Curated annotation (Swiss-Prot):
Transmembrane segments annotated in the record for this chain: none
Keyword Phosphoprotein: yes
UniProt: ATP binding residues: 19-27, 42
Subunit structure: Interacts with PknD, interacts with and phosphorylates IncG.
Pfam families tied to this protein: FGE-sulfatase, Pkinase
Leading EC class: transferase
EC number: 2.7.11.1
Species of origin: Chlamydia trachomatis serovar D (strain ATCC VR-885 / DSM 19411 / UW-3/Cx)
Keywords tagged on the record: ATP-binding, Kinase, Nucleotide-binding, Phosphoprotein, Serine/threonine-protein kinase, Transferase
Family label: Belongs to the protein kinase superfamily. Ser/Thr protein kinase family.
Catalytic activity: L-seryl-[protein] + ATP = O-phospho-L-seryl-[protein] + ADP + H(+); L-threonyl-[protein] + ATP = O-phospho-L-threonyl-[protein] + ADP + H(+)
Gene expressing this chain: pkn1
Protein purpose: Together with the serine/threonine kinase PknD, may play a role in the specific interactions with host proteins during intracellular growth. Phosphorylates IncG, an inclusion-membrane protein required for the modification of the nascent chlamydial inclusion.
Residues covered by the Protein kinase domain: 13-276
Record's protein name: Serine/threonine-protein kinase Pkn1
C-alpha cells in the first residue's frame, strides 16, 4: 500500500471511502487511476494473508466464484497483491446492510418473505452447482441491497463463512457486553445444522434456509416443539409447512435436493386435492340404503344403474363410486350357467370392441439436415521457431528476469477475432454460456445484441474486434474453429518481431498513427500498419487473452525451464497482452504483462487464435 499526499492507494486503485469491515476483509470504495471506474476492494487482514492454509482455500474459492455471475453474489473482477497483503477487486454496488439491521423494528409481509427466500434459494443453487457452499447462513451473514426501494438478497461472505467460524465467534466475544455476546452467539447457533460443526455443505445451507424462512415468517426460532407456520399464518398461499419442515430434517440425506423446487405456491388444485383426501375415509364408511348386496350380471348392473339414476329431486345422498378397470368388470363371476348365457349377448360384443386395435398411420419424421453457421476464417502467419529473448529490464517487476526461451514454429491469426466472426460462433452454440455455465460473452458489454431471438451486430462494428468476451469464450471459439489461444511466450515473440526483440510491435517507438491507444473506442481490425511480421493490432485496440495462467514470478521458473514455457499449472487469473484502446503508451510494450480472472468481462478484452504446425 502506497501513500501519496495523504491519499491511500492499493495498486492502481485510489481509496475514496471506507465501507466497513466484513468477516474476512476490510471493504473500501476505490477508483481506478486510469480508467476512472469505481470498484469495491476487499482487503484481507495481514493475519489471513500470511496464513498458508487460508490462502490455499481462498485461492480455490476465488477462482470458482470469479467464474459465475449472479445479482446476489459478489462480482469478482480480479485479485491483486500489494506487498504482503492481498485484495479482491469487485464490482461497485449500491451499498448493503445486514438482514438483522433490515429487520430491526420491521415486520415483513408474506410477499416480501417469498421474494427474499426465492432470491436466496436461486443464489445458493448456483453456488452449490459449482461445488461450493455458503456455510454459516444467519441474520448477519445475509445482507440486503436496495433497487427502486425493493430489498434484494446479497451474500458477501459466500464460500468463506464456514472457514472463519472460530474467527467470527472470537470477534463477537470481543465486542459488546458478555450478555449481548452470548445472546448473539446463541442466535447464530440456532441456524446451524446438527452436523455443521464437522461438515459444511449443501445440506447445512438447506437447514439454515429453513430456520431463516421460519424466523422471517413467525418472528421466532424453530426451537423445541415449535408451532407450524400454517398455525401462525392460516391464510397463507404457500406450503411453508412442507418447505420448512423438509429443510429442518435431522438427517441431512432427506433434506431437499433443490431449494427452488421445494418452495412452491399452493394452487387451488392442490387445495382441492387436500380436501378430497380428508373426505375420502369418512365417505368410504357411509352406507347407502336399498343398495343390493349381491352383484348381478353385467346386464343387471346396467338396469340397476338406470334405476338409481331416476332419483327424485327431494332425495339427496352422498355416493362414493370406486372405479374399477374394465378387466375387473369382465371377470366378474356369476352364480349359474343360465345367468352366464344371458350375459353373453352383452359381454362378447364388448370384448370384441375393446380388443379391436385402432388403425393409426405411423408418423415418419422427414429428416432435414440442420444447417450450422460456418466460421469465417482468418488468414494466419507462420512464425518460425527458434531461440528468443523475452522479458524487460525497464518494465514491471513481473517482467524480470530477461531470459532466453525456445519455441517450435506456430501459426498466428493476422488480426483479432471480429464481431462478425464471433457472432457465427454464438449462433452455432445457441447460448452465451458454455456447458459448465461459464459466460462466453456478456452482450451488454459488447457490440452484439439479441433482438427478438436474433443476434445483431451494431451498425458499423462488424469488422471491429469482439469485446466483452471472457477467457472461456475465447478458448471455446478457438476450439470451435480447430485452433487454440496462443501461449504468453508465443504472443510476446510474435509481437516483438521474433528474434528482433523489438520494444513495441511497431518498432522501438510508437505513436497514435501506428496503433489505437488512449482513445475512446475500438477501430476496425487492420486499420493501422502491420508489424514487421505482417501482424495487425498487436499493439492497442483490444487486450488479447492468452492460454497461460498468470504468475507474478513465473519468469524465474521459465528461465530454468526455457523449452516452450506454458505458464504455471494453475492460478487465479489468465494472461492478457497487447494493451487496448484505453491504454497508455507504456502498456503497449511487447513485454508488458496484464492479467485478470478467466470469467472477467471488459469492453477492452478480445483475442486472436493460434495453431500448431502439423
Amino acid at each position: 500500500m502506497e501513500e501519496r499526499a495523504a491519499v491511500e492507494y492499493w495498486g492502481d486503485y485510489k481509496v475514496i471511502a471506507e465501507l466497513g469491515h466484513g468477516l474476512w476483509s476490510r471493504d473500501v470504495l476505490a477508483e481506478h487511476r486510469f480508467i476512472k471506474k469505481r470498484y469495491i476492494l476487499k482487503i484481507l487482514p495481514s493475519e489471513l494473508s500470511s496464513s498458508e492454509n487460508f490462502m490455499r482455500v481462498f485461492q480455490e474459492v476465488i477462482v470458482q466464484l470469479a467464474a459465475i455471475r449472479h445479482a446476489s453474489l459478489v462480482a469478482i473482477e480480479n485479485v491483486s497483491r500489494e506487498g504482503d497483503r492481498y485484495f479482491v477487486v469487485t464490482e461497485e454496488n449500491g451499498g448493503t446492510i445486514s438482514l438483522a439491521q433490515y429487520l430491526s423494528g420491521r415486520k415483513l409481509s408474506e410477499e416480501e418473505v417469498v421474494h427474499l427466500i426465492q432470491q436466496l434459494c436461486d443464489a445458493l443453487e448456483l453456488v452449490h452447482s459449482i461445488g461450493l457452499a455458503h456455510g454459516q447462513i444467519h441474520l448477519h451473514s445475509v445482507h440486503v441491497s436496495f433497487f427502486n426501494g425493493i430489498a434484494n438478497i446479497y451474500l458477501p461472505e459466500v464460500g468463506f463463512a464456514s472457514l472463519l467460524r472460530e474467527r467470527m465467534f472470537s470477534t463477537i466475544m470481543q465486542s459488546g457486553s458478555a450478555r449481548e455476546s452470548i445472546t448473539r452467539i446463541r442466535d447464530l447457533l440456532m441456524f446451524e445444522a446438527p452436523e455443521e460443526q464437522e461438515v459444511f455443505g449443501r445440506e447445512a445451507d438447506v437447514y439454515s434456509v429453513g430456520v431463516l424462512a421460519y424466523y422471517l415468517l413467525v418472528g421466532s426460532f424453530p426451537w423445541g416443539s415449535f408451532p407450524k407456520p400454517s398455525l401462525c399464518m392460516p391464510d397463507s398461499w404457500y406450503d411453508w409447512d412442507g418447505f420448512i419442515l423438509s429443510c429442518l430434517q435431522q438427517q441431512r440425506e432427506v433434506r431437499p435436493k433443490c431449494l427452488r423446487e421445494a418452495l412452491r405456491r399452493k394452487t387451488s388444485g392442490e387445495q382441492l386435492q387436500v380436501t378430497l383426501d380428508s373426505c375420502r375415509e369418512p365417505l368410504r364408511e357411509m352406507e347407502i340404503e336399498d343398495t343390493p348386496t349381491e352383484l348381478g350380471p353385467p346386464s343387471a348392473l346396467i338396469r340397476e344403474g338406470e334405476r338409481l339414476c331416476e332419483v327424485k329431486e327431494e332425495q339427496h345422498a352422498f355416493v362414493l363410486v370406486e372405479a374399477k378397470s374394465i378387466d375387473e368388470v369382465m371377470v366378474t363371476t356369476v352364480d349359474s350357467e343360465e345367468e352366464l348365457e344371458s350375459s353373453e349377448g352383452y359381454a362378447n360384443p364388448l370384448q370384441s370392441l375393446l380388443a379391436r386395435e385402432p388403425v393409426v398411420s405411423r408418423y415418419v419424421e422427414v429428416e432435414r439436415e440442420e444447417i450450422k453457421p460456418q466460421p469465417l476464417l482468418t488468414e494466419m502467419i507462420f512464425i518460425e521457431g527458434g531461440e528468443f529473448s523475452r522479458g524487460s529490464g525497464d518494465g514491471q517487476r513481473d517482467e524480470l528476469p530477461v531470459h532466453n526461451i525456445t519455441l517450435p514454429g506456430f501459426f498466428l491469426d493476422i488480426h483479432p477475432v471480429t464481431n462478425e466472426q464471433f457472432v457465427r460462433f454464438l449462433e452455432c452454440v445457441g447460448s452465451e454460456q458454455d456447458e459448465h455455465y461459464n459466460e462466453l460473452i456478456r452482450l451488454k458489454d459488447s457490440r452484439i445484441q439479441r433482438r427478438s431471438g436474433r443476434l445483431i451486430i451494431e451498425p458499423g462494428y462488424a469488422k471491429h474486434p469482439v469485446v466483452g468476451v471472457t477467457w472461456y469464450g475465447a478458448s471455446s471459439y478457438a476450439c470451435w474453429i480447430g485452433k487454440r489461444l496462443p501461449s504468453e511466450a508465443e504472443w510476446e515473440v510474435a509481437a516483438s518481431g521474433g528474434k528482433l526483440g523489438l520494444r513495441y510491435p511497431t518498432g522501438e517507438e510508437i505513436d497514435k498513427s501506428k496503433a489505437n491507444f488512449f482513445s475512446s473506442d475500438t477501430t476496425p481490425v487492420m486499420s493501422y500498419p502491420s508489424s514487421i511480421l505482417g501482424l495487425y493490432d498487436m499493439a492497442g485496440n483490444v487486450y488479447e487473452w492468452c492460454q497461460d495462467w498468470y504468475s507474478y514470478d513465473f519468469y524465474e521458473s521459465s528461465a530454468l525451464e526455457p523449452d516452450a514455457p506454458l505458464g504455471p499449472p494453475q492460478g487465479v487469473y489468465r494472461v492478457l497482452r497487447g494493451g487496448c484502446w484505453k491504454s497508455l503508451k507504456d502498456d503497449l510494450r511487447c513485454a508488458h504483462r496484464h492479467r485478470n480472472n478467466p470469467g472477467a468481462i471488459n469492453s477492452t478484452y478480445g483475442f486472436r487464435c493460434a495453431k500448431d504446425v502439423k
